[in-house]
Amino acid sequence: MSISAAGVATGLGANVELKSNVGSSSSSVAGVRLFTSRKAQLRRCAAPATSASLYSDANYDLNNYKFAPIKESIVAREMTRRYMTDMITHADTDVVVVGAGSAGLSCAYELSKNPNVKVAIVEQSVSPGGGAWLGGQLFSAMIVRKPAHRFLDEIEVPYEEMENYVVIKHAALFTSTIMSKLLARPNVKLFNAVAAEDLIIRGDRVSGVVTNWALVAQNHNTQSCMDPNVMEAKVVVSSCGHDGPFGATGVKRLRSIGMIESVPGMKCLDMNAAEDAIVKHTREVVPGMIVTGMEVAEIDGSPRMGPTFGAMMISGQKAAHLALKALGLPNELDGNYKPNVHPELVLASTDDETASA
């Protein structure tokens, strides 16, 4: 099949096409070899419940363009009603993922495959993605060491293949792709510009998070009467990154209340040791709270890994399956996992998934 670059690789030019043969893992854009899933194919499905547009005429006149009329109050009501409905829905949820960097997004994506699991993502920044919008030192390319490239195949992110690693031409391509797929799923809600100020603790178990608007959380020294809100959860996944003003907040709070002994911080950089250690030590550190991503290095003293991102993705996936295990659901760790995918939203990535969807 032939896919227009305008819809897949924006910025390559109107005359460039991304050609992909189903059953083949290679593609070519302007002479650069790219790779996508070997078995990827666009699946046809029933029309979604809501339409992308009420108007089917593509030949509109840009010189005399007119929008449909609307009352300002309708805009306010639509935004407010939906947000408040989401807050009510997720006031008591299955999993809260704190931090929407590459590990948190990968975790939420994996969890969202089960449409019966409610997932709330809490991100203090207006723009989710953490450090995954760029590679190292503000450079564009994202490096992912093998075999983590299989996750890129699943979510349909093109890359250039090298011997032991792959290169995504811009890190934003990964982040925007996984977010667009994840947030389209009805069992997921992203609460960005919201900070997790504290944890809900019952006995020896983490039972949710204390939330507030990020701007309030950042200005408690001048705003003394801004009480927070809460989200109860069966499982909290802390993916708050390495130490910083809003970094490693989950494990630092556990240390301050004596639920863990220490947070030694990450050691100096060693890419080869770091990525294996991050995935290996992703775990439930106390009942009800799983730690993933670079926050794992803070609690275990693992080396920092620098600008390689594979461990973030796989650590996030492992955290998701730890959460599924904690919920008593099928998971990869117990060897009984069969993803219940959203057939109307995802690209088939394996023959088995295609057959079961």
From Swiss-Prot:
The family database entries (InterPro entries) matched by this protein are listed as:
FAD/NAD-bd_sf (IPR036188), Sti35 (IPR027495), Thi4_fam (IPR002922)
Give first and last residue of the transit peptide: 1-51
- Keyword presence, Secreted: no
Q: Where in the cell is it found?
A: Plastid, Chloroplast
What is the reaction catalyzed?
[ADP-thiazole synthase]-L-cysteine + glycine + NAD(+) = [ADP-thiazole synthase]-dehydroalanine + ADP-5-ethyl-4-methylthiazole-2-carboxylate + nicotinamide + 3 H2O + 2 H(+)
Q: Does the keyword Chloroplast apply?
A: yes
Q: Name one GO biological process term.
A: thiamine biosynthetic process
**What cofactor does its activity depend on?**
Fe cation
Q: According to its UniProt record, where is this protein mainly located?
A: plastid
Top class in the EC scheme: transferase
Key words of the record: Chloroplast, Iron, Metal-binding, NAD, Plastid, Thiamine biosynthesis, Transferase, Transit peptide
This entry's comment on the bound cofactor is:
Binds 1 Fe cation per subunit.
The GO molecular function terms of this record are: cysteine-dependent adenosine diphosphate thiazole synthase activity; iron ion binding
Q: Which residues cross the membrane?
A: none
Q: What is its EC number?
A: 2.4.2.60
Per the UniProt entry, the disulfide pairs are none
Binding-site positions, substrate: 103, 123-124, 131, 196, 227, 242, 294, 304-306
Residues with the modification 2,3-didehydroalanine (Cys), per the entry, are: 225
Q: Which Pfam families match?
A: Thi4
Q: Which GO terms describe its cellular component?
A: chloroplast stroma; cytosol
Q: What does the PTM comment state?
A: During the catalytic reaction, a sulfide is transferred from Cys-225 to a reaction intermediate, generating a dehydroalanine residue.
Described by its record, this protein's role is as follows: Involved in biosynthesis of the thiamine precursor thiazole. Catalyzes the conversion of NAD and glycine to adenosine diphosphate 5-(2-hydroxyethyl)-4-methylthiazole-2-carboxylic acid (ADT), an adenylated thiazole intermediate. The reaction includes an iron-dependent sulfide transfer from a conserved cysteine residue of the protein to a thiazole intermediate. The enzyme can only undergo a single turnover, which suggests it is a suicide enzyme. May have additional roles in adaptation to various stress conditions and in DNA damage tolerance.
What the record says about family reads: Belongs to the THI4 family.
Assembly with partners or alone:
Homooctamer.
This chain belongs to the protein called Thiamine thiazole synthase 1, chloroplastic
Q: Please name the source species.
A: Physcomitrium patens (Spreading-leaved earth moss)
